[in-house]
């Protein structure tokens, strides 16, 4: 029994142990067998939403058998975006927010998504809704997408007509041809949100650039003018032509410091040094060589060659052998004086032809006759000159352009001159050298001849050249000098006057010289306000190329004004359309009032013009097929053009004239202090010709500016504002300038005057301006253009303050004098004169009693005035035989005329009914009346085609007819 009980107890204990072990296992399973999350991943790490949009994120917890996959959602900024516990995000406002999902099983894992919240654009705005560009110009359009925090800011640019206006992806537009295109910017969000700009491609006008060149060639360059012209064309003119520059070369002046070459084997007629001495007396130096030295002598260093008469036969033989060299030198711009009397004391005889001349040997002339007087050449000579063989021959052949001064007994020339290429030949067969040292009728002649031929020189010193160029109004002015002589010229005190001339014209000086003279020449350029450039002349081709580049650099800096022009401007139309364009012009004799800040004027609207020149013939509102490039009469012009039969745009421009500055300036020495007082006055006489009468005491001038600087040799000064003050020391040179501004804002050319405190007389300065380079003349009415009474403004002055006397001469193209007076010529001088160019010359002196020293005379100052015709309207004329009302029997006879004799090129017929409605229009053919019935008005206009002038339409002519035709 006990054994059985023991066995039961054992089994009970085993059962209890197993039961306890099972409970332990359950507890262990509860605490050690749960699966934790190892990672959490969101469906997005970045998200973009618009305001009020929603999106749902999902969170994946791994591993798949994780005991607890629950997550908790949160937002870093609940004001920007909210998130619920299902991961649904709601965008509340623009911004950036972080949405986070975190595990719930205690594993402390999380994952985040960055959400950027934006909003849709609601508008797009361009910087321009309308743009107007001339052909070839560019502009930038910019697009502003609103609101600024919009989701999409990129835009796409398009153009409605890429042949008219192009546009790139950045909004850069370019005008290609006349017309209009719509340029559109669209937001790239697929909603067709866009904005547009209407771009009109117009004919915005611009001034054609003008350049005037004065070129001086120093003979030290050892180059003849013909070769130099070729280089000038290659390196300078070609660049001007290629850029469509309106240019002139005023002159190509070859010069040297007064040096003559005498070629002789011995003095003529035992005259000793007479020829040499006479040349020296004229301020020239001479070199003397024999004929056999011609081949080894560089001729280009001389301005003149003098060949005396009476040489041995070997001399003339040698002369013939060097003929080609002498001919090339003369054609290149030299002056050759050939005293051709042979068979004298030395028995030589020249034969054949020499520079276009032949003569009859041994044709001795005891008498010669003066047939053309000259104040220098024939001074103190009798009309009929006799002597022992006054001439040793006559010229039997000579160039047709010769000017003959004297003839022999066969009425053949014995004294003549003629142009030969770019040079000049003066030849004569008198025994001048003999009578220069012996008595007789010819005694004065050699002195006269040398003085005449030396002063006749084709070249002048650099200083003289700069004093006399004729510049065109509104051009850029350039002086180009090549050579090494100038370095000495610019050291002279007279250069103060030259600087005044350069400043008056704002001229640029390009000095091509030896590097040894660089500092001197650069100093001169600096005195010219730096307007210029020094170039080393060791490589002439390279130097001229640099000069051309410099000129183009200056011209390319010139400012262009789109709506303000001067009467002398040439106007470019910047269009390149292949389509037909018609033009129409109207004009008012007034100017636009721009209400500029500097215009202290109470007037409103447009300002009427004083001294207007009337309405331009072409400004009649008629449509024409050619554009007008020159507006010779001031006023406000409206320019319209039709493109594909539609009026595209009107351009309104002002055409005016520059104001004119006036002042008087001189110095006077104080007797006590010895200092010099400076008197500057009369600036209130300055005026603007467009407003001088209607603007009270101002005379159209709203601003004025005085400046001065010292230009004494060795002094480098800059401009000082205001008038030159008194109390100046002696022996100083100054230039003073005045500029004035008119109501339109146009500044005048500077009026510059030279003032000196030197106790010596200075020659007065002759100078005047002209209101226009051309004067229209109505030849039908034998009258000048309206408003052209005063065409010149006198600007002459004397640096010492002396009173001046004036001498005015007007000559025609043939050298005939049409006016000679001490008074300035007016327009009436030119009434009834032939069309063409006239030279107006002024010379002054300070006589009879200047303050210091003897009376001095100014250099002559010359401007050219061109008389041009006025085109008159053609006259429309036709007759109608309306005896019959049947269309086929109505006869129309047209017989229009033009008062100037110009060809009529267009005839426009218009037929209107009794209500004014146009029913027929034809061009250059009679209207067909066959389909008409009733009362009609026939109107004819005709257009002329003058040469070199704008074409004009006639006034319309109308006639009424009755037609009984189709019903």
Curated annotation (Swiss-Prot):
SMART domains, per the entry: BID_2
Regions crossing the membrane: none
The protein's name in its UniProt record: Uncharacterized protein CA_P0160
Taxonomic lineage from the root: Bacteria, Bacillati, Bacillota, Clostridia, Eubacteriales
Signal peptide: 1-29
Residue ranges annotated for the BIG2 domain, each copy included: 38-107, 133-190
Keywords from the named record: Plasmid, Signal
Source organism per UniProt: Clostridium acetobutylicum (strain ATCC 824 / DSM 792 / JCM 1419 / IAM 19013 / LMG 5710 / NBRC 13948 / NRRL B-527 / VKM B-1787 / 2291 / W)
Gene3D superfamilies linked to this entry: 2.60.40.1080, Immunoglobulins
């Amino acid at each position: 029994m006990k054994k059985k009980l023991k066995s039961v107890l054992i089994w009970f204990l085993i059962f209890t142990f197993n039961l306890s072990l099972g409970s332990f296992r359950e507890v262990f399973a509860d605490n050690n067998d749960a699966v934790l999350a190892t990672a959490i991943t969101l469906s997005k790490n970045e998200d973009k939403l618009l305001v009020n949009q929603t999106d749902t994120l999902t969170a994946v917890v791994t591993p798949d058998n994780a005991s607890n996959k629950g997550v908790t959602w949160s937002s870093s900024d609940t004001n920007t975006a909210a998130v619920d516990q299902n991961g649904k995000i709601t965008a509340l406002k623009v911004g950036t927010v972080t949405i986070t999902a975190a595990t719930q099983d205690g594993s402390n894992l999380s994952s985040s998504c960055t959400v950027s919240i934006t909003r849709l654009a609601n508008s797009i705005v361009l910087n321009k809704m309308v743009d107007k560009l001339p052909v070839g110009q560019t502009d930038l359009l910019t697009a502003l997408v609103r609101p600024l925090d919009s989701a999409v800011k990129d835009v796409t640019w398009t153009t409605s007509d890429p042949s008219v206006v192009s546009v790139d992806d950045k909004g850069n537009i370019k005008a290609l041809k006349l017309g209009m295109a719509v340029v559109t910017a669209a937001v790239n969000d697929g909603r067709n949100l866009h904005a547009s700009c209407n771009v009109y491609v117009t004919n915005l006008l611009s001034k054609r650039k003008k350049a005037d060149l004065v070129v001086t060639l120093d003979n030290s360059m050892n180059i003849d003018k013909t070769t130099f012209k070729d280089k000038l064309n290659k390196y300078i003119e070609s660049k001007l032509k290629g850029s469509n520059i309106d240019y002139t070369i005023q002159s190509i002046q070859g010069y040297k410091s007064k040096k003559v070459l005498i070629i002789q084997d011995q003095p003529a007629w035992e005259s000793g040094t007479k020829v040499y001495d006479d040349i020296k007396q004229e301020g020239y130096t001479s070199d003397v060589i024999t004929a056999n030295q011609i081949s080894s002598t560089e001729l280009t260093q001389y301005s003149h060659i003098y060949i005396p008469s009476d040489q041995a036969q070997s001399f003339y033989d040698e002369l013939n052998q060097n003929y080609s060299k002498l001919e090339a030198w003369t054609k290149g711009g030299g002056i050759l004086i050939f005293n051709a009397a042979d068979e004298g004391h030395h028995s030589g005889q020249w034969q054949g032809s020499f520079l276009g001349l032949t003569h009859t040997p041994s044709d001795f002339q005891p008498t010669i006759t003066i047939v053309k007087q000259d104040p220098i050449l024939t001074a103190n000579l009798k009309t009929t000159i006799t002597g022992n063989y006054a001439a040793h021959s006559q010229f039997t052949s000579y160039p047709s352009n010769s000017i003959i001064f004297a003839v022999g007994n066969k009425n053949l020339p014995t004294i003549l001159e003629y142009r030969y290429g770019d040079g000049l030949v003066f030849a004569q067969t008198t025994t001048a050298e003999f009578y220069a040292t012996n008595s007789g009728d010819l005694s004065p002649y050699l002195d006269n001849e040398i003085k005449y031929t030396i002063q006749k020189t084709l070249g002048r010193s650099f200083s003289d050249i700069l004093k006399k160029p004729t510049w065109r109004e509104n051009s850029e002015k350039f002086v180009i000098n090549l050579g090494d002589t100038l370095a000495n010229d610019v050291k002279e005190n007279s250069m103060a006057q030259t600087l005044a001339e350069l400043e008056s014209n704002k001229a640029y000086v390009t000095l091509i010289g030896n590097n040894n003279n660089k500092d001197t020449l650069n100093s001169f350029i600096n005195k010219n306000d730096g307007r210029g450039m020094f170039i080393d002349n060791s490589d002439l081709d390279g130097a001229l190329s640099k000069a051309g580049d410099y000129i183009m650099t200056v011209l390319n800096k010139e400012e262009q004004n789109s709506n303000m022009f001067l009467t002398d401007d040439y106007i470019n139309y910047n269009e390149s359309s292949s389509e037909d364009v018609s033009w129409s012009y109207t004009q008012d004799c007034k100017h636009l009032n721009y209400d500029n800040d500097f215009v202290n004027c109470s007037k409103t609207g447009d300002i009427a013009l004083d001294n207007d020149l009337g309405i331009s013939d072409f400004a009649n509102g008629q449509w024409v097929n050619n554009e007008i490039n020159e507006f010779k009469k001031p006023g406000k012009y409206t320019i319209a053009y039709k493109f594909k039969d539609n009026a595209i745009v009107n351009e309104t421009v002002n055409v005016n004239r520059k104001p004119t500055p006036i002042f008087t300036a001189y110095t006077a020495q104080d007797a006590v202090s010895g200092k010099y007082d400076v008197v500057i006055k009369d600036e209130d006489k300055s005026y603007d010709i467009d407003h001088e009468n209607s603007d009270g005491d101002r005379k159209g001038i709203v601003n004025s500016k005085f400046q001065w600087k010292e230009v004494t040799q060795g002094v480098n000064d800059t401009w000082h504002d205001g008038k030159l003050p008194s109390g100046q020391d002696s022996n100083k040179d100054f230039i003073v300038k005045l500029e004035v501004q008119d109501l339109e804002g146009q500044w005048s050319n500077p009026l510059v005057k030279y003032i000196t405190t030197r106790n010596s007389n200075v020659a007065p300065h002759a100078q005047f301006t002209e209101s226009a380079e051309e004067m229209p003349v109505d030849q039908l009415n034998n009258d000048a253009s309206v408003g052209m009474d005063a065409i010149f403004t006198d600007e002459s002055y004397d640096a010492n303050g002396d009173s001046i006397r004036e001498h005015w001469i007007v000559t025609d193209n043939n050298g005939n004098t049409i006016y000679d007076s001490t008074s300035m010529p007016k327009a009436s001088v030119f009434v009834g004169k032939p069309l063409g160019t006239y030279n107006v010359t002024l010379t002054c002196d300070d006589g009879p009693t200047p303050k210091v020293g003897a009376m001095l005379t100014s250099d002559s100052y010359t401007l050219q005035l061109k008389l041009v015709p006025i085109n008159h309207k053609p006259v429309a004329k036709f007759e109608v035989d309306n005896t019959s009302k049947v269309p086929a029997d109505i006869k129309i006879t047209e017989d229009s005329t033009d008062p100037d004799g110009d060809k009529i090129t267009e005839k426009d017929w218009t037929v209107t009914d009794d209500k004014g409605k146009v029913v027929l229009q034809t061009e250059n053919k009679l209207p067909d009346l066959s389909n008409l019935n009733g009362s009609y008005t026939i109107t004819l206009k005709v257009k002329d085609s003058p040469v070199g002038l704008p074409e004009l339409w006639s006034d319309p002519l109308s006639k009424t007819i009755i037609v009984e035709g189709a019903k």
